[in-house]
A protein has these predicted regions:
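Extracytosolic ligand-binding ectodomains
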Residues: 2-24, 28-459
């Protein structure tokens, strides 16, 4: 069936009230209409995710042990592997991803027509060896698609096995190094985040960008992304400074002092005072009195600085800017999606800063439904489990010969999920439509809304 532009049918719901997911401009969606949920899902028998500090080990569940998901019709079900850590240090997050996936499959069960997904959850134990065993197990059971693993090392370990069997992988990592050749990553890459916030800074007239990054693989990726984004936006790169990611704030402080040319600006102030003192006119005396209130003389050579930290770390580093006499009302701090946290908004040095984000409403609806079912607040990005399972369920309803082909998975019009619109590219990366928010005083607000179609990004 031909594509029908601007047709945005719902294909999943959070209960009867929330219509959040849509398959954008795709033949499959144009051929189907959602059914209404007539029954509430049974209360899940899965315990709420334990605290990350001490996750409780749990056995790998099987498809038969997941009461939230209605049993698929064996005659028309499509096996899909779900590979996440359900034991080990990351068990809590792995369980949250699985919980979210169960929600998606229950919601999608309301849609009539086509095959249904038979989810095959397996415990990767958070190790490459565990991931290999889990992948081999589900593929031996006929899995036609693998959702997960979580960690890039695990994805790298299973990729050759999946390719050998022609089974595509949709992983939860954000490491682009493992993407491609049948492996797709759903995670939020620093590259897409930096590009969005730097583009917005350019649209607001900022011209000179700096970056303060940890000296780590992640920091190097951010630094490279800043260079590319600055060049693409036609801006000027001021400086990129790095620090030991394990260093205390006291050891990061000298890096910020040098980056802001603090000593040079103090020397400029002393020189200016000496020049004015040598003069004996009233104007010079007035100017000298004004300089007495200053700590430095002259501005820093950047209008914005990218700081890819979060939590307590960003709250410790950001105050170093005003400490070294940088006016944060004029110099914008630019962050990552991890700044979308009320605790981060309590830092005065970040007020006025910008960061990328996903649309609030779908995430809030997902979180409310998750809390109702599991009695706990989902951790950030647990919704990727929902998006992945919903993607699999929708594609499973297409013709068996084309349901999980590269062409189906990489539909250019994309999909809309809990975290906004996204599409998977032939290179295996996820492109997303992100909003930009501004940090307020213990609050944040959207200053550039997320697009609702990819046409808005390309036009």
């Amino acid at each position: 069936m031909p594509l029908r532009p601007h047709f945005l049918p719902t294909f999943a719901r959070f209960g009867a009230r929330f219509a959040v997911f849509a398959l954008l401009l795709a033949p499959l969606a144009a051929c189907q209409q959602p059914g209404r949920l007539t029954a509430q899902p049974p209360q899940p028998q899965v315990a709420a995710p334990p605290a990350p500090a001490a996750p409780a080990p749990m056995p790998a569940p099987t498809a038969e042990s997941l009461p939230l998901v209605p049993p698929p019709d064996a005659g028309r079900s499509v096996p899909v592997g779900f590979l996440v850590p359900l034991s080990g240090p990351a068990a809590a997050f792995g369980q949250a991803l699985l919980n979210a996936a169960q929600m998606a499959l229950f919601d999608l069960a309301a849609i009539e027509g086509g095959a249904e997904v038979a989810l095959l959850p397996r415990d990767t134990k958070g190790t490459p060896e565990g991931a290999i065993a889990a992948a081999e197990d589900v593929m031996a059971s006929g899995a036609q698609l693998l959702l997960g693993p979580l960690f890039s090392a695990d994805v790298e370990a299973i990729a050759p096995l999946a390719r050998a069997r022609g089974v595509p992988v949709v992983a939860f990592t954000n490491d682009y190094a493992v993407a491609g050749d049948g492996v797709y990553i759903l995670g939020f890459t620093p590259e897409m985040q930096v590009a969005r916030v730097v583009d917005y800074a350019a649209s607001r007239g900022l011209q000179r960008i700096a970056a303060l990054v940890p000296d780590s693989v992640y920091g190097q990726r951010v630094a490279a992304a800043v260079r590319v984004a600055v060049q693409n936006a036609g801006l000027n790169l001021s400086t990129i400074a790095s620090y030991d990611p394990s260093a205390s704030t006291n050891l990061v402080s000298p890096v910020v002092r040098d980056m802001t040319n603090y000593e040079g600006r103090r020397a400029a102030l002393r020189q200016q005072r000496q020049q004015l003192t040598a003069l004996d006119d009233e104007a010079s005396k007035l100017a000298l009195r004004r300089l007495e209130r200053l700590e430095t003389y002259g501005d820093v050579d950047f209008d914005a600085v990218v700081i890819p930290e979060s939590g307590g770390r960003i709250k410790a580093i950001a105050p170093l800017l005003p400490f070294y006499d940088v006016d944060t009302r004029r110099v914008r701090a630019l962050g990552t999606i991890d700044w979308d946290d009320p605790d981060t908004w309590t830092e005065p040095a970040l007020v006025g800063g910008w960061y990328p984000s996903t649309p609030d409403a779908p995430r809030a609806e997902f979180a409310a439904a998750y809390r109702k079912l599991y009695g706990a607040t989902p951790p950030p990005r647990a919704s990727l489990g929902y998006d992945a399972a919903a993607l699999a369920a929708v594609l499973a309803r297409s013709d068996s010969a084309s349901r999980f082909t590269a062409a189906a998975i990489t539909q250019p019009n994309g999909f809309a999920g809990v975290e906004g619109i996204f599409r998977l590219t032939p290179q295996g990366l996820a492109e997303r439509g992100l909003a930009v928010k501004e940090v307020g005083s213990r609050s944040s607000r959207v200053v550039s809304p997320a697009p609702t179609t990819f046409e808005q990004l390309t036009n």
